[in-house]
């Protein structure tokens, strides 16, 4: 049987069987070392060759913090540490051959009671980052101060220097109740109200740092790298950097991206879609037009003669980055121009076709905008999806 079956002593850089005092000292040292604001971690992040390497270092830091807290949940407790060192209980290869005091001990083996509990993870801390469409195209780096709840290192999350085991739950934090119904017996674990699930009670004065609360508020600066091409709803996760609970894996800090709408552009997949003014003579004869990209660059675009005005311009690889770099799609607004331009154009255009056969009623016309079609209430939710699909259905690309 291994003397360190889960590697708890190894992660603390201790020899198997080290005392609880040695474990506490090593835990505090390792947690301080792997905190993102520690000199050791700052130096590693500073020397990282790329953003990807920095993200990897932060992820490894969170994983190390989680492993340290898993080790702490066992080796800080004399009873659990004794079982761990001897390979007994949940750390053994199989159930013992007997010795259960009653049915509740058997139930505890199967359900993972407090003395044999599963390692649960604390809920994540989530924040929404709102960026403009331009920022989602070019990317950006933002810094945020995030408050999280950490286990008090002064009292090791016990609330005081001297604590005693809760007599109501025998230190388990939960107790098992039995109910009989129609000849069947059901067993259920209930959080102990005598110790509020902690398994112990404070003797004497509470901890001066946390005032008996067992946890303290911690503020950490997070550098969030928002990469070019990020989509609305994407998540940037810092594993193990969130709230802590004794005996639990620390939670994550998650930043969720929200992208604002833009007055000039919209995103369709990885394509960037916009509008461009094109003089009629350029549309007919070809030429050059100028356009300001969403990233601020000035583009000089060569335009071939239009075969039909139901045509969109496609500039390859000028869209959003991703697994496939998108294109810049521009819907042309054909501009006729001044009176002199109109006269020159009329000289080269062929005469209109003859009046078709039939009886016609004369009416006058004027220019106006297209009205929005009426929609049933049920169709309103489809408006966003339909606008993107209808755009591409009405234009051909070349």
Swiss-Prot record:
Binds 2 Zn(2+) ions per monomer. Zn(2+) 1 binds at residues 152, 155, 207, 210. A zinc finger (CR-type) spans 139-219. It holds the Pfam family DnaJ_C. Zn(2+) 2 binds at residues 166, 169, 192, 195. The keyword Coiled coil does not apply. InterPro entries: DnaJ_C (IPR002939), DnaJ_domain (IPR001623), DNJA1/2-like (IPR044713), HSP40/DnaJ_pept-bd (IPR008971), HSP_DnaJ_Cys-rich_dom (IPR001305), HSP_DnaJ_Cys-rich_dom_sf (IPR036410), J_dom_sf (IPR036869). GO terms for molecular function: Hsp70 protein binding; unfolded protein binding; zinc ion binding. GO terms for cellular component: cytoplasm. Gene3D superfamilies: DnaJ domain, Heat shock protein DnaJ, cysteine-rich domain, Urease metallochaperone UreE, N-terminal domain. One of its GO terms (biological process) is protein transport. Keywords: Chaperone, Cytoplasm, Lipoprotein, Metal-binding, Protein transport, Repeat, Stress response, Transport, Zinc, Zinc-finger. Residues 7-88 form the J domain. Residues 367-386 are annotated as: Disordered. CXXCXGXG motif repeats lie at residues 152-159, 166-173, 192-199, 207-214. Homodimer. Probably involved in mitosomal protein import. Belongs to the DnaJ family. This is Mitochondrial protein import protein mas5.
């Amino acid at each position: 049987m291994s003397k360190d079956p889960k590697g708890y002593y190894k992660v603390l850089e201790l020899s198997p069987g080290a005392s609880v005092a040695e474990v506490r000292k090593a835990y505090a040292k390792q947690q301080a070392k792997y905190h993102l604001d520690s000199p050791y971690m700052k130096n590693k992040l500073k020397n990282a060759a790329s953003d990807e390497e920095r993200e990897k270092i932060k992820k490894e830091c969170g994983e190390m913090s989680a492993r340290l807290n898993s080790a702490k949940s066992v080796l800080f407790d004399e009873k659990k540490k004794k079982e761990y060192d001897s390979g007994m209980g949940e750390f053994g290869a199989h159930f013992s051959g007997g010795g259960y005091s009653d049915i509740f001990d058997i139930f505890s083996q199967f359900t993972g009671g407090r003395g044999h509990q599963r390692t649960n993870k604390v809920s994540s801390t989530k924040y929404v980052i709102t960026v403009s469409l331009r920022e989602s195209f070019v990317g950006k780096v933002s810094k945020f101060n995030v408050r999280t709840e950490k286990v008090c290192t002064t009292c090791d999350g016990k609330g005081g220097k001297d604590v005693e085991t809760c007599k109501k739950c025998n230190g388990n934090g939960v107790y098992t109740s039995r109910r009989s119904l129609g000849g069947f017996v059901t067993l259920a674990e209930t959080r102990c109200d005598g110790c509020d699930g902690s398994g112990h009670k404070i003797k004497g004065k509470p901890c001066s740092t946390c005032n008996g609360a067992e946890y303290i508020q911690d503020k950490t600066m997070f550098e969030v790298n928002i990469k070019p091409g990020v989509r609305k709803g994407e998540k940037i996760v810092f594993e193990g950097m969130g709230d802590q609970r004794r005996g639990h894996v620390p939670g994550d800090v998650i930043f969720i991206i929200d992208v604002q709408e833009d007055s000039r552009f919209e995103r369709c997949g990885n394509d960037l879609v916009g509008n461009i003014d094109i003089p009629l003579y350029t549309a007919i004869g070809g030429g050059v037009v100028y356009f300001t990209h969403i990233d601020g660059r000035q583009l000089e675009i060569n335009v071939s003669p239009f075969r039909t005005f139901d045509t969109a311009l496609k500039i390859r690889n000028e869209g959003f980055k991703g697994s496939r770099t998108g294109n810049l799609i521009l819907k042309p607004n054909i501009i006729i121009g001044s009176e002199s331009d109109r006269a020159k154009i009329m000289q080269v255009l062929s005469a209109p076709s003859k009046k078709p056969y039939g009886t016609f009623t004369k009416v006058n016309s004027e220019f106006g905008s297209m009205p929005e079609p009426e929609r049933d209430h049920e169709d309103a939710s489809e408006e966003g999806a339909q606008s993107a699909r209808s755009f591409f259905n009405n234009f051909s690309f070349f």
